[in-house]
Amino acid sequence: LEKAEKIWSEMEFSRVMSVDDDWMRQFFQGEQKLGDILAELGRVFRDGGVDAAPLRKLIHENVDEEKIRGCGKEFFIVTFSLTDMKELELSVSDIPEGRLEDFLLACAYLVGFKNEPMGDGKRDIDGGIFNNVPADVLVEKGYTDLIEIRIYGPGREPRVSLPEDGEMYQIGPRVKLGSIIEFDR
């Protein structure tokens, strides 16, 4: 927990993507001119999208795949394969050894990010665009009592039918958190 708090308290845009922190702060505070925004967007798209290499480094330095696989807890992610044009609902046991970092990074790829192929040559993006609250995945796996932590980001939210003996608890913010790539709120 302390490590996560330290990462969050030191979070800057540039620790997640190759951008200028001051420019990004000015953008989110509405201080950038439209012409400057359009010029920056043009540059980013000419370069193939926003580079997430800093996030890959952050994941590599802080995620211990062996500990995650050996912790005795189930761990699920949802990505969307751009290569195969389908949603992937994966448990950690479905992910080949040594590839968890790739899939965690894919969970952070949004439209507009430079999407580097994963180890198998395929390209995935965050599954939240198609299933923002994948509680249905857990119900399909047999879970009956769920705690859903919400951030109210963009994306589709499929309806979930819990079993009769199931309960869903939702935890969500009372205030708007800002953009999903805004870190100083």
PLM region descriptions:
Residues 2-185:
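Patatin-like phospholipase
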